[in-house]
A protein has these predicted regions:
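Active-site environment of divalent metal-dependent phosphoester hydrolases
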Residues: 44-47, 78-81, 135-139, 164-167, ...
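Non-catalytic positions within long, well-ordered alpha-helices that form the structural scaffold/packing
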Residues: 30, 122, 180-181
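Mid-to-C-terminal alpha-helical segments outside catalytic/metal-binding sites
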Residues: 202, 206-244
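A structural motif
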Residues: 34, 154, 184-185
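An N-terminally biased module of ancient metal coordination in phosphate/nucleic-acid-related enzymes
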Residues: 1-68
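Short acidic/histidine-rich active-site segments
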Residues: 184-200
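Extended substrate/RNA-proximal surfaces in nucleic-acid metabolism proteins
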Residues: 49-158, 236-244
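Active-site neighborhood of phospho(di)ester-bond hydrolases with catalytic His/Asp-centered motifs
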Residues: 2-4, 37-40, 72-76, 129-131, ...
């Protein structure tokens, strides 16, 4: 399996607090058959930036050589009006050198403003992956409009493991499952902030995915869609949610 959203890098955001915790996260991820983790520290201008991230990422990779888990670098970028300037400045916020960008939607903005932001980002030739939209009540209260938005702007959707098993409450769980039911989600990721998340939340969510989804779709959510992103083999081109 591949995990495209994890706060694995220590001491840069609200994720792993130290190198030992990061190594423990990798160890447990390997136990649960995760072969690749994309480390996605928060990038939120004025709150979290990527200063020092590369150095800690390289240290972590060097310390984790005994584990059979590939570690790649990305970011979880907060989508506000400043994001367009960040993209224009060509700061290293994407998944490696790809055009894919994992974005977190603002929780207090109107759906109309969020949709406008997404269209502007897409117009900058960015392939958008929306992180855990099921947790954003303002967005999910405009559920049908959101589905039209991801179709029109050609966005991909990443669900959190915790959402699927009810960590964030009944509304979020049911919304996540509705997205799964209509196959509007493209990835399920850990959004792990500590070793415990890999030990408990992620395996429980994987089990639930296989209960809720047919095997082909489950594999896409957990592995094959993510693999096509990191190998730049394809992208979602239509609402059918197929990659390639």
């Amino acid at each position: 399996m591949l995990d495209i959203h994890s706060h694995l890098i220590f001491g840069v955001d609200d994720g792993s607090s130290c190198l030992d915790e990061s190594i423990r996260m990798i160890e447990i991820a390997e136990m649960h058959n995760i072969s690749t983790i994309i480390a996605t520290p928060h990038f939120h201008n004025g709150i979290f930036n990527n200063n020092g991230v590369l150095e800690k990422f390289e240290l972590l990779v060097n310390k984790a050589v005994d584990y059979h888990v590939e570690i790649r670098l990305g970011n979880e970028v907060f989508a506000d009006d400043e994001i367009l300037n960040i993209i224009k400045a060509k700061k290293n916020i994407n998944f490696g050198n790809s055009q894919y960008l994992l974005i977190e939607l603002p929780y207090s903005d109107s759906f109309e403003h969020i949709a406008n932001l997404i269209y502007k980002i897409a117009a900058a030739n960015i392939k958008i992956i929306i992180a855990h939209p099921e947790r954003n009540r303002k967005v999910m209260k405009s559920f049908h409009e959101f589905i039209k938005l991801i179709h029109t702007a050609n966005c991909q959707v990443q669900l959190d493991a915790g959402s699927i098993i009810g960590v964030y409450g009944a509304f979020v769980k049911e919304t996540a499952r509705q997205l799964l039911k209509i196959k509007a989600a493209d990835f399920m990721a850990s959004n792990a902030h500590c070793a415990r998340d890999y030990m408990t939340l992620y395996p429980a969510a994987v089990q639930k995915i296989y209960q809720l989804c047919d095997e082909e779709y489950a594999i896409k959510l957990l592995e094959s869609n993510a693999r096509k992103i990191i190998t730049v083999e394809g992208s979602i081109s239509e609402y059918g949610r197929e990659i390639g």
